[in-house]
């Protein structure tokens, strides 16, 4: 099948992309409005950008009317956010939080999640997540869209603090088996941590022997 993206609708492109780019990690993001309301929302258009400095990027799609979502607006106005890793223990609550509440209502309270103070940033963290990345906003870039109207806001954050549960921290890294992370697939499907295998990176000398 050969398909030209320019001849497809936004929905058709979206379906192909989320079915082809997977599994995708989930960033469960808390932000805070100027009024002090804590917003929480999951995003799977998310990944690491650089390790030095530690930067992460999240694409936050715009609302149907073209205005920024709470996460992007709060991030730009307050300049901070917290990313929570989604695992098998908290994924149900994360899914509940995706309901589109008005800005003056908190998804944290609606989903029955527990706010705890963050170490460095003013935005609260959530106790239900065993790995948390506290971030300062580096940039918010409007991207995509047609006719001059952006389709999303690309939120770039610099990690200023890692909060990792003691039982997950192993040899300077993360024990993935103990974490049991959850990823997004296509449609309403999610992926669990399952079968893995390792491959040593080849060297030029090995390949020429």
From Swiss-Prot:
Reported cofactor(s): FMN
SMART domains documented for this protein: Flavin_Reduct
Organism superkingdom: Bacteria
Gene3D superfamilies in the record: Electron Transport, Fmn-binding Protein, Chain A
Keyword annotations: Flavoprotein, FMN
Listed GO MF terms: FMN binding; oxidoreductase activity, acting on the CH-NH group of donors, NAD or NADP as acceptor
UniProt family annotation: Belongs to the flavoredoxin family.
PANTHER family per the UniProt record, alphabetical: FLAVIN REDUCTASE LIKE DOMAIN-CONTAINING PROTEIN, FLAVOPROTEIN OXYGENASE
The name this protein goes by in its record: Uncharacterized protein BH2278
Organism: Halalkalibacterium halodurans (strain ATCC BAA-125 / DSM 18197 / FERM 7344 / JCM 9153 / C-125)
Lineage: Bacteria, Bacillati, Bacillota, Bacilli, Bacillales
